[in-house]
Amino acid sequence: KFSSFITLFTTCFNLAWQEITYVTEANVNDDRKGFYTQAINYYMRFLGMGVLLLIPVVYVIYPFFINESYSAAKVYVPLYLFATIASVISEFLGEIFTATKMNRYLFWTTVTSGTLNVISVHVLIPIWGVQGASLSLLIGFCVNTVMRLIILRKEISISLDLKFLGFFILLAVVVSMVYIHGAIWSNIISFVIVGVICLFVFKDILLQILQSIKLKKNKKA
């Protein structure tokens, strides 16, 4: 249910993104490198920080939305959410391949990651059960995403915010550990801390929004 919410939201965004990419490609004078670099980095930030905020929220609301007989499944949520995010990002990158007429890469990146997923499922499920299935999904989509990012870096010269990615991975581990081993109050604290971090991560956007609001107020005055 929780991953379906993410998928629904991102599907709507991807439809709009598809239109934007085609318009960008039609305007050949646009800065493709700058446009796609900014779009990819911001998209990863929004999804990454969004899921880190969602995880402690799920911990709190889980008993109210999910029947008590499924309480044991609560531990599987973080890894499955991360797998969903990896899937969404790979789809997002796929739209760029389509818009830039690099469809030839879509097939073999999908086949490679799909093959790896099938292999890892058979290896990990006997060891970790359902958690192994989620992990194999995460591995498959992460490999797909990494391959597509490497290709885009080569073809369009995009540059990734590696500092944020490293920080996100570290924070994701901490938030997941708090979710699995912590109590309700530790997850509430986790939510607050991640929320504060979001203010720093998106400070540039927030400042632009505040400046825009001030300008509108000044014009009305």
What are these model-derived regions, one by one?
Residues 178-221:
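Membrane-proximal transmembrane or re-entrant/amphipathic helices at the cytosolic face
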Residues 104, 111-145, 177-192:
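Membrane-interface helix-loop junctions in multi-pass transport and translocation proteins
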Residues 1-7, 71-75:
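Interfacial/gating helices of multi-pass transporter permease domains
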Residues 54, 121, 148, 152, ...:
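Structural signal for membrane-spanning alpha-helices in multi-pass inner-membrane proteins
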Residues 81-112, 123, 152-156:
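Membrane-interface junctions at transmembrane-helix termini in multi-pass inner-membrane proteins
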Residues 13-14, 36-87, 118-122, 126-127:
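Alpha-helical transmembrane segments of multi-pass membrane transport and lipid-handling proteins
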Residues 7-41, 94-99:
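Helix-loop junctions and terminal segments of transmembrane helices
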Residues 4-5, 51, 84, 110-115, ...:
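Residue-level recognition of pore/gate-forming positions within transmembrane alpha-helices
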